[in-house]
Amino acid sequence: MVHPPVGIRSLAVSFPRVIRRNDYYIEKYPELVTQAEQKSLAKMFSLVGDIPSNEFELEMMPYLSDPFRGTVERRVLSPGESSLTLEYRAAKDALDAAKLSTDDVDILLVASFLPEQIGFGNAAFLARELGLQCGAWNLDATCASTPVSLQTACALVQAGGYRNALVVISCTYSRFFDEDDTLSWFFSDGAGAFVVSSLKPNQGILGTKTINTSILCDQFFFKLMEDEQGKQRLRMHVTKGINKAISETAASLLHTCCEGAISAAGITLEEIDFFIFNTASAWFASFCTRVLGIDPERTINVYPLYANIGPALTVGNLYHAAQLGKIHENDLVLIYAFGAASSASASVIRWGDVVLGPVPVNETDSTVKNSETGSIIPC
């Protein structure tokens, strides 16, 4: 069956105003930094044995002497900011870039990790802020939410029931960690949005492969706790065996999804012009290029700018790759992401004439790190 060409028409990102660098923690929590090897972040990312036992641990090795595990900057919500404010800004910028009004949006898909309130997703709340009249659906695939949402939106538009789908992704990890928890050094906040519409012939989504990640179901969990003011707050926790679980499954998930998407698209790995990975650690892009045997120049790593922003990482990497001119119209792009207790997913798309939203606040003089050489590429 031949599907009409459907894919990303515009793309935008949004980040909090506060940029928190390593010096902040060194000055405020010197004892924590000194004792980092006994704290939660170090326990999350350390060798299972005495020597690397797989590609993931091999790429992690150079970062083990760094108490921040390669993290450089984080974006953190400031007073008055929330997942909804980030989502609203990204959504508006994506619509403006596509030259669409709210009346042109036929469906809103929102993946918030996590929503602002317990029990309800952000979709209807964001629709209210945007003034949308269309349906508003919540979608959750944890850190794989971007490719899963892209697949869903493309399928809806290809089926003919919708013309323009607005997809919004956010992650606000800072709400779920105390600042003096070393795990908070690794996580960050951000959002992205894109419009999915009809494109030129042969452009858009060409093939996908998604599998579940039930093997990682028990590695992350949330607890409802009371803070010092007696307010109930969700706090995120990780198990002691998380590093072993991720390092032993990451390569298999990557191979299965990427090879499946490439096969579904009817192409070969060598034909892919550029790769987008959810770079949830400083070394994940290098890990992926090693496992797939591809040139590191064919991908990008925004981790030095944003740390781990969960599902929003994929949108951030896409945005900066396009902004830097690494992706051009009609290039073949492979997008891969995986999330614990959800899915691993890959999509092959032929890039269209994608219009970008404005460069985010505080981003004008920022930099993106080349995953192979460690050099800095100006944005």
Task: Set out the residue ranges of the language-model regions.
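Claisen-condensing/thiolase-fold acyl-transfer catalytic domains that form or cleave C-C bonds
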Residues: Y88, L114-E116, F125-R128, Q133-A159, ...
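Residues that mark the start of a beta-strand
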Residues: P5-G7, Y162-N164, L332
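Short beta-strand segments
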Residues: R9-A12, D140, A165-C171, V196, ...
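Conserved beta-ketoacyl condensing-enzyme motif
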Residues: E59-Y63, R75-A141, C257, A261-A285
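Buried hydrophobic positions in well-ordered alpha/beta secondary-structure cores of metabolic enzymes
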Residues: I8, A94, V105-L108, S149, ...
